[in-house]
Amino acid sequence: DKKMELKSSNICIETSEYSDYEKTFACCLSSVNLYYFDEWKDDPDFIFDMNILLDCVIEEYIQKGSKLPGLECAVRFAKEHRSIGLGVTAFQTYLQKNNIAFGSIESYQKNHEIFSLLKEQSDKSSRWMAEKWGEPEILKGYGLRNTTRLAQAPKKSTTFIDGGTHLALS
């Protein structure tokens, strides 16, 4: 409803957001490991807190980036959108661990269960943060703090950070 065109590049495929000459897309991403899904799925604070963590990282980026020349467009975007993205890793490992065939009805049901939980808790945390800490200008009236809350998890960079190994097969 704001008539903002989404643009893409070969740099970021995890999520898409608006950008222009005054704003450079910037987001903060993390993943939850589905290998341990059964251990954290009933914790009502786990996903909620992960999104709060990501918003706090965006805030630190804004505060520190505001003092660095050359980051003006990215900081402006971060302030206005507070774009975060929580993704998942190791879905296929979870399926293997639980003897669920990939592509089976059971795997589709598990996929729906997982991502419904992520969406519900991510939206809930963004609404809570908007109420407690305020909505960014672009989201005034929506009751949300973050323009994006979920994202595809970056795999290659995560693997490098993990030291070149990964619980997931991808």
What are these regions (language model features)?
Residues 49-75, 79, 98-155:
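Internal maturation/activation junctions in enzymes
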Residues 27-32, 82-84, 100, 148, ...:
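Flexible, active-site-adjacent loop/turn segments at secondary-structure boundaries
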Residues 83, 87, 92-99, 103:
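Short, positively charged, Gly/Tyr-enriched micro-motifs
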Residues 153-170:
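C-terminal catalytic subdomain
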Residues 46, 83-87, 118:
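Short, contiguous, pocket-lining structural segments
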Residues 1-78, 88-95, 165:
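Function-dense linear segments that define catalytic or interfacial modules
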Residues 22-23, 28, 90, 143-147, ...:
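Short, well-ordered loop/turn elements at secondary-structure boundaries
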